[in-house]
């Protein structure tokens, strides 16, 4: 296929046109008074969003050179979203600002490589300064404030996230789901829950809720099918002497073994309940091992030379309470050793870091949550499906932002942190004049998020930026109310990780684009439907002429 190649100024101009189209669509969403963007969908109602990355993902341009520019800036938003979960619009605004200033310098004859070196030098100094001005986000109030800001000033969402973190821990698993009502709500599942219920409804001992509930039961874990009752009779007799109920978690319990356990249950003998083990294949073995560590038991596995006939009561796990329903099982307060549980969690966390599959990561995180003792579910409520999707996006953003805040602390929000980080660039010098120009490019670009927030609020950007620069510390501008003051006291916080990631990714991609000298794309195919038919048609005519 033939290629279309553009060089130098022509290539950079078309690339910059694409950058501007995408960035101009994304940046209107920035800040508390950011505007909405309406996105047409091929099916259903149009989507309305204030989420920068959602807008960026929708943009595809007809001109291939312009589209390359747009897609490179989209990469800035996506990378920032992947690392910090928020800050996509800030990253896009920064990338555009660096490119606009940088392209002017390149057009004026400066060395693009030196400009990039100057920008990189300035970014390193600014990131260090962001780290220095950050404060830890330890308390619920700070977490709620970060969540509220990221959810476009929705305080209810911030409070729900803070409450969820209180209940399941800052590293606990919090998921976001679409609710059925108009109100947002929080549900917390304590203990380890997995999606397998009783094998037979005859195991249920609470007829009103159709659940089997046991206090201080023994828990037998087996990684094979149990079909012969004689295999487990010795163990059942030992448990019966202790007068405690027994929960059996196995690959399956069937035939004679299941029938005997059910009949025994109904006659009021040994209280038992059989449940299929969660997961499949290797994941099932791993989850059985998780349950064993949580309950202080041992998985009876023939692979390591164990057998059910010789199993003893010491190999059984125990828990304070077990509730088994039709579709799930909850084990609360397992008797496992705390150090063993922490070591297991640490081991799974290492697997998460090494994994390249999003699906595997999600499943591993679920296992961490179950071992850590709880999962919080935020159920989002709204009046319409369109509003529900928009709100769910905002809650997801807020959740990621609060996690980022817990990791690296918080900085004053509203673009103030980047303005304060300019202090680190005041005396910074490059190796030559072109590098100094690169440092100056970043100086101007770091004001861009604050300028855009103010512009979206309908105020005069230059006036506000000068006022904020003349202040110090957390002094900034609350665009929602039009008031100057201490951003931390006003509850306007950004996670330091978000500001850092936005700056690093924007500068990285912008630097690569500034040093671009050629662009290659496929030549457009001819769309004339008759183009390939002329010769064939004429040949046919010739044939007919010969016949006459």
From Swiss-Prot:
Pfam families: Cpn60_TCP1. The keyword Cytoplasm applies. InterPro entries: Chaperonin_Cpn60_CS (IPR018370), Cpn60/GroEL (IPR001844), Cpn60/GroEL/TCP-1 (IPR002423), GroEL-like_apical_dom_sf (IPR027409), GROEL-like_equatorial_sf (IPR027413), TCP-1-like_intermed_sf (IPR027410). It is an enzyme of class 5 (isomerase). Keywords: ATP-binding, Chaperone, Cytoplasm, Isomerase, Nucleotide-binding. It comes from the Bacteria. Together with its co-chaperonin GroES, plays an essential role in assisting protein folding. The GroEL-GroES system forms a nano-cage that allows encapsulation of the non-native substrate proteins and provides a physical environment optimized to promote and accelerate protein folding. Forms a cylinder of 14 subunits composed of two heptameric rings stacked back-to-back. Interacts with the co-chaperonin GroES. This is Chaperonin GroEL. It comes from Psychrobacter sp. (strain PRwf-1). The lineage of its organism: Bacteria, Pseudomonadati, Pseudomonadota, Gammaproteobacteria, Moraxellales.
């Amino acid at each position: 296929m033939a290629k279309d190649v553009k060089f130098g100024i022509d290539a950079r101009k078309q690339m910059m046109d694409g950058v501007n189209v995408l960035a101009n669509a994304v940046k209107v969403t920035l800040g508390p008074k950011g505007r909405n963007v309406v996105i047409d969908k091929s099916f259903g109602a149009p989507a309305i969003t204030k989420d920068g990355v959602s807008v960026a993902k929708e943009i595809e341009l007809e001109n291939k050179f312009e589209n390359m520019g747009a897609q490179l800036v989209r990469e800035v938003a996506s990378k920032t979203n992947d690392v910090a979960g928020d800050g996509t619009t800030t990253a896009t605004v920064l990338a555009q600002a660096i490119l606009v200033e940088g392209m002017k310098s390149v057009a004026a004859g400066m060395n693009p490589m030196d400009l990039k070196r100057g920008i990189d030098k300035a970014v390193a100094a600014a990131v260090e300064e962001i780290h220095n001005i950050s404060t830890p986000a330890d308390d619920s109030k700070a977490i709620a404030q970060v969540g509220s800001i990221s959810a476009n000033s929705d305080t209810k969402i911030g409070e729900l996230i803070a409450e969820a973190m209180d209940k399941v821990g800052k590293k606990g698993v919090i998921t976001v789901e679409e609710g059925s009502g108009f109100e947002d709500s929080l549900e917390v599942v304590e203990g380890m829950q997995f999606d397998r219920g009783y094998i037979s409804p005859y195991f249920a001992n609470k007829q009103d809720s159709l659940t089997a509930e046991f206090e201080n039961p023994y828990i037998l874990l087996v990684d094979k099918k149990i079909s012969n009752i004689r295999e487990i009779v010795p163990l059942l007799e030992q448990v019966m002497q202790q007068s405690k109920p027994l929960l059996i978690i196995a690959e399956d319990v069937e035939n004679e073994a299941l029938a005997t356990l059910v009949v025994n249950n109904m006659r009021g003998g040994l209280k038992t309940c059989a449940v299929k083990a969660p997961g499949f294949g290797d994941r099932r073995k791993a989850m059985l091992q998780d349950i064993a560590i949580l309950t202080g038991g041992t998985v009876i596995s023939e692979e390591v030379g164990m057998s059910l006939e010789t199993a003893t009561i010491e190999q059984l796990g125990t828990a304070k309470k077990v509730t088994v329903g039709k579709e799930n099982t909850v084990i609360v307060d397992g008797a496992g050793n705390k150090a063993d549980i922490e070591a297991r969690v640490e081991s799974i966390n290492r697997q998460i870091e090494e994994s390249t599959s999003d699906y595997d990561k999600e499943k591993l995180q679920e296992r961490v949550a179950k071992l850590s003792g709880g999962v919080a579910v935020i159920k989002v409520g709204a009046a319409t499906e369109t509003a529900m999707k928009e709100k769910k996006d905002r809650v997801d953003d807020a959740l990621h932002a609060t996690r980022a805040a817990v990791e690296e602390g918080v900085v004053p929000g509203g673009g103030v942190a980047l303005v304060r980080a300019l202090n680190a660039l005041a005396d910074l010098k490059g190796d030559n004049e072109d590098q100094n120009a690169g440092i100056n490019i970043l100086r101007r670009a770091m004001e861009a998020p604050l300028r855009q927030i103010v512009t979206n609020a309908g105020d005069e950007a230059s006036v506000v930026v000068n006022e904020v620069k003349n202040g110090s510390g957390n002094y900034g501008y609350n665009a929602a109310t039009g008031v100057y003051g201490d951003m931390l006291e006003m509850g306007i916080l950004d996670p330091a990780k978000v500001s850092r990631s936005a700056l690093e990714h924007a500068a990285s991609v912008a630097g690569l684009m500034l040093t671009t000298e050629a662009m290659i794309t496929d030549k457009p195919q001819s769309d004339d439907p008759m183009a390939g038919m002329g010769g064939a048609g004429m040949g046919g005519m010739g044939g007919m002429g010969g016949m006459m």
